[in-house]
């Protein structure tokens, strides 16, 4: 049963359960317990599962560890502390693991000194175990295991099949999952949930402690953390003190009219604002949504304000930079040496980066929870305000960010979705279970169903994965995919096959697929990585930006690029990076705002009245409200406002007589991707004609030289048939091929590493396509193929909410209004311009939108 913690304990009550040495250390170090600690420590001490959601600087880590350290101290004081693991701390980041080890050193050494003062020798060990741990360190851990083991989800699953170390896990009483919100919504979390159930089966009940940033609904994350006990929901207390920190958030529109302004004016205003914000604060963290955006901001600030910024006081931080450069950036931040750091997503999670007094979000982060998480990196101490500024870049961005601002200030957060019944991850874990020891088939299924992610796993899907692993698809041997387990149906058991099972498992586990990237070296030092596609475009003498610095390309050998430092104007790299999708919940809030605005115009409200409403409702200033007002007014007068109750379908003829149909379906890119592909498939089947698709968060368009019947094709889609139509639309696409390669790697159909050799991503891709074709012809319901389809439709796209949209239309809750326009309506500008991204520079795209805007103004005046 999941319950919210209502009781806050007194300091005296908490000190009474702490070992005297631990209590003494705490009194010397802190004035008092934080709210999170008052709510959680007593129940962790009692062995209850707890999920803590609290802001940065609220003592979350100590909340989890204090009673554990106290219990270990008591065991050591009584001479009962064994040489084995009592607590496992799991985080998604190796850097966070290293932070935690450093942060634990202070209390453990201080408590050790207090004990020594009483003539007692206290040794509580902690250690980090990740893929970076050396063989020497691993050997030491076997002889002297840490009492607190700090690790990652992937390493935990390896330790579960390591025979000698498994014995050291038999005393585990506590598991802490940090940054649980960043694991719960992806396959790393699914993988971890099964590892926790396997650990529970090995050692018996243990206390589960989850630490989370602001997330909704907390009940779902709590269920993900604790799972089930053979059909019954395990108990968990939710400690929610995410409200504690005061928020200082504002939205900045760089110019008075974001459409009428030319690109140079917008660029100048944008960087002047960024410069002023940085100058007014000690340390500023700027978030962009792409790595290319990160590089561009660093380069522009240094080139526009050379007297203020150099390599010594502003740096970039993103996943394509080398580990050494990322660590250098983090260390300089901690020491207060940087004025500003620009990041894409790599600094969102809670690694220790010292004092940040301002966070700037450059353009929409696409969800309220991500905005709060990023802004929460500022004001590290509990009673300091989290200060954030959202700088917008166009009118769609302005509306989106205004709703993010409103929801953030009002505490309305998007829902988290936890993937379920992932058959590739299941295959990996069944193999791991078989390596541990032979299992009863039914008992193994019961243990698997204890995971929240597999609570509804069908027996049919489970047996199909067993069948694949047992080599019952004998034809796969022709493609070098061999049986990994044996199954005895008479005895109802399965177990491992082969002497290399443990090696194969340990070197191929995990859920993060290998990506194509080339190493960039300057003078023998690795400075970062670039995408393979980008490397192929480089010619000798080309210059590009990496880590905020300019390099000249000399040559490439294999997957290594040789460069030298350069100066002058660079070519900003077009990194391959999936854009962040707009959350469905936020999309609906924007649609509701559109509906309210539509009503205001229909009832003839005055400009002043509507302006007052916008400023009050969205918490924005007059400049932002004016741009929003004009944007909606133009759309209303020209074509009508699409909203939660009305989907506009806009027909117009473009350059050279090309036909366009724009669907104003503001439901986020993931929903629109699903619907648009299904519509395009129906058109192709009906008219034997391929159509061009362009998809955004705000809608999608179809384009063709001739008749398409787009609306007719859309009306053919029903809630009941969308999944089947989309399944057919996805077959033989690069999207499915890519996802199948990832799933086949997780399910160990494609071995990324074998006997010390690593298979390149290129070879994996080729092998994936061969296997996809083979299994499609062998059995259309092959479990890993089914999983690849599920991943595309449910995780990459959002078919569930796409079906909801079709239900609204079927039930009459949303009407479809067809319109014909000479020029695309204002709400369609960005979507239409997006289709020209490959042939238009950014400045030309802005100019294209400005010209369309002027044409609309002229049309309205007629």
Swiss-Prot record:
**The UniProt record lists the keyword NADP:** no
Task: Give the EC number.
Answer: 5.6.2.-, 5.6.2.4
Where is the region WH domain? 425-513
Give the keywords, sorted. ATP-binding, DNA damage, DNA repair, DNA-binding, Helicase, Hydrolase, Isomerase, Nucleotide-binding
**Nucleotide-binding as UniProt keyword:** yes
Q: Where is the Helicase C-terminal domain?
A: 269-424
Q: Where does ATP bind?
A: 37, 60-61, 178-179, 360, 377, 380
Q: What EC class does the entry list?
A: isomerase
Q: Which PROSITE patterns match?
A: HELICASE_ATP_BIND_1, HELICASE_CTER
According to the UniProt entry, where does the motif DEAH box sit in this chain? 178-181
Residue ranges for the region (Domain 4) are: 514-862
Reaction catalyzed: Couples ATP hydrolysis with the unwinding of duplex DNA by translocating in the 3'-5' direction; ATP + H2O = ADP + phosphate + H(+)
Which terms does the record give in the GO molecular function aspect?
A: ATP binding; ATP hydrolysis activity; catalytic activity, acting on DNA; DNA binding; helicase activity
What does the record give as the function of this protein?
A: DNA helicase that translocates in a 3'-5' direction on single-stranded (ss)DNA, probably involved in DNA repair. Most active on three- or four-stranded forked DNA; flayed structures and Holliday junction (HJ) substrates are unwound slightly less well. Also unwinds 3'-tailed duplexes; both RNA:DNA hybrids and double-stranded (ds)DNA with a 3'-single strand (ss)DNA loading strand are unwound. Substrates where the helicase loads on a 3'-ssRNA tail (DNA:RNA and RNA:RNA) were not tested. Blunt-ended dsDNA is not a substrate.
Under the heading NCBIfam families, the entry gives: PRK13767.1
Q: Subunit notes for this chain?
A: Monomer.
Q: Any idea what this protein is called?
A: ATP-dependent helicase Lhr-Core
Q: Which organism is it from?
A: Methanothermobacter thermautotrophicus (strain ATCC 29096 / DSM 1053 / JCM 10044 / NBRC 100330 / Delta H) (Methanobacterium thermoautotrophicum)
